[in-house]
Amino acid sequence: MSYYYTRMSTGNFKRRGPYNKNDKQHAESKVAPPILLNRLVERYYASNPHVKDVTTNHELEVKFGTKGVKPLTKIDYDSVIRKLKSLGFSCVNEQGGYLLRMYYEHLDKSGQFKESNIRTEISGFRAIQEYCKSNDILKLIGMEEHMRSVKFVKKSRVYDNDEMVHDVNFNDFNFRVSYQKEEEISMSNIIIRNVTQNWTQTKKSFRYINRVTFTHDDFPINVDISIVKSSHREGWDLKKTYTTDEAGVFSNTEVYEIELELDNSKIGPGTRFSNPESILVALRKAIKYILMGLQSTNYPVSIVEQKTALQSYMKLLHGESYDVEKRIYPKNFIGPSSYTLQIENIIPLDDNMNVPNIRRNYVVTDKADGERHLMYISNTGKIYLINTNMNVIFTGVITDEKSLFNSLFDGELILHNKSGQFINLFAVFDVYYIAKDDVRALGFMVENDDQKTRYRYQIIKTALNILKPKSVIKDEGVPMRIEAKKFYPEVIASAGNGSDVSIFAGCKHILTKVENGLFEYNTDGLIFTPAFMGVGGDAIGKTGKLTKTTWEYSFKWKPPQYNTIDFLVVTTKKNGEDIITPVFQEGVTSSDFNEYKTIELRCGFNQRAHGYINPCQDVYDDKLPDFGDKEDDEQYKPVLFRPSNPYDPEAGICNIMLKKDDTGVMQMFSEDGEVFEDNTIVEFKYDMTRDHKWRWIPIHVRNDKTTELRQGVSLNFGNAYHVAESNWKSIHNPVTQEMISTGVNIPDVEGDADVYYNRLVSSNKTMGLRNFHNFIKYNLIKAVSKKGETLIDYACGKAGDFPKWIDAQLSFVFGIDKSKDNLENRIDGACARFLNYRKSRKHIPYALFVNGDSSLNIRNGSAMLNEKAVQITKAVFGEGTKDVASLGAGVARQFGKAVDGFNV
């Protein structure tokens, strides 16, 4: 169902319901919007707006984002400003001017409270600041330095022969053109005198505006781009209150507005814009410029075309039976993400391990500093880009090659070269569909003795050779370059013939090119792709799901100093207000104290998918679930970052020093100068040389992810927990440029080999043997143990014998294993299994698990592989401290449990 939205006097939009032909102001017309626009401009010009009037101003405005389906975002705000600057528009004050607009209520003739069509406006930050001290407009007017900062403005519709002049809605492009009059009302007016006298007893709504205005000598137009904070809402309306504090206007979430307004001083006789036709040409061009900024392309298209392109994309993935009415989410972006490359992914090959290793059947390419997009060639040959937020960009490029219609490629859009010049290069690094044919299951690169003729890299090169792109505008040059990325090695050597050497040679070749400045664009690392596997798959010929996912076999490498994590920032609060802590220094007055905020760093976590955050610590601390506890209904949620490898329970707590913004307000800033606040997703780097809790450094605000979160488009909380853990591990145990270029001087990862063997090796080959083993073990435990006895399990693995321990009605089990992953794995490790069984069984033995070598002496601690394991083992045998705070309540409960040994 379609709705129309009316602009309130507050400047906000109110949904009024389905379009109704009887609605006078926004009635749907059978006349096309371009024709209505012509008529509107003619009426506007006929009113002689260029004739100066001290009190009345004729306004012809274009407002964007009016359809209500897609609110403007910070990304839109920044993108439009960049586009305007690139087109020669300039701004006198890029910090913007400040306005506080207030809309008061009054009693109408029927005795009902109604919002007045006269707004009160305060301009200038200092005047606004002064008003907020008293919330008394009369007091502000009485101040000589601020009295000229206040004005009262009446906004009204325009009539032509008693007929209201309607707005013109361009719904397909999400903007509206309106013609209205503004009249400044004198402070001596009886209405204004009454209002100001009763100001403090009158309820009002507020809009706090930071407005930047861009102009161009060739256009009679002001481009107003605003950041707006408003009063609390009651449904669709702004709530009326007496003061700004009650309204919450300065703490509420900001919204963005973009408007064009004709500058009446630049039109009329004697100017270049002396008739409606010349004004229309300039207006249409300016509208196109804004749409270019909003859509990130010089070829903006309608909302209908964008929607059709997305629906065609979804049909390509899911078939013609796909329900086109389904909402499309960022999870529908099917290009898989990569894990951070770890030491274990580059160590010498070990047949006893099944960890993905780039030494065996991998190719490498440079990681361009661009934006990830899918390139979709439609069934008519139009070429679109789809970004990770599922926004559609028409490239202005078409192809006549019908064999490539309905095809889908993956790549990076690189807008500028290293000198900042616009190159608009789309670098293709994978292909998923060709002419509706799903090619994701094919291998990526050919093997030197392989007779296959189809592999994805060859398909990319062949497709781009026959693409013959051209501009949608006749006789215009192709607006976007489309090229295949270069991968190394181009032919994969057979196993044993130097395949592990060639991958490091490829890395060295790329990194040498980077050092010598031979890449046209900026790079920030390397990407490793399995040579023979299907996209997202875990074996040759298999593919992953048609959804957003992280591919376990795809890796990215960045120089260690560029390893970062995206966190959701949550400020610590007291009574609903952010806690601000002063840093006291001798000889410094209180007004000059440095101040900081303490923030929590959170990332997305799903217990079902990611397991427990730190299951063994939960066991040690006695944080055990009870029988009948259910999975959290909110499966994916933001949780405090408490990494386990290396373990740091306070890694997710961070202090951020505050700095003054342009208005003198103390704010948190990223390294690139952006303000961020509570409920914002920010990219952080980690500096281990700094003091604890000061090591995380905010470097960049992720406006794309923050927009997704705040608009409810998707559950985006920064990096997923497992990705953040992977990056954390890489930060502390980095793969250096020397390692990745040579394959030498790589440290051992002793103790982790079985992690990957257990995780990745298929179990069906050993199923029969394991069944027999379990049968024997079950009978042994049942035969020798009695109810309430204790048991020690050497090399306990992942506690697969838990059902046997439960059936034997044991009271306590002490498990030892050399593999930390067997014990600590968040999903199926021994501790996680213990916690899961607690939910489903009423009676279950208590258990503790420690990391140790069962072939050595356990009781004296020499078998243990870390200090925590030594401490726990001593406690179980009745030695060492009994302090609950030191041991953890779960360990303290079992103190001395095995002082006389174990029963079994």
Stretches found by the model and what they are:
Residues 379-418:
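Conserved loop->alpha-helix
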Residues 4-7, 11-323:
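Phosphate-end processing signature that detects enzymes handling 5′-triphosphorylated RNA
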Residues 798-810:
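Conserved SAM-binding loop of SAM-dependent methyltransferases across substrates and taxa
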Residues 749-786:
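Class I SAM-dependent methyltransferase Rossmann-like catalytic core
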Residues 831-898:
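S-adenosyl-L-methionine
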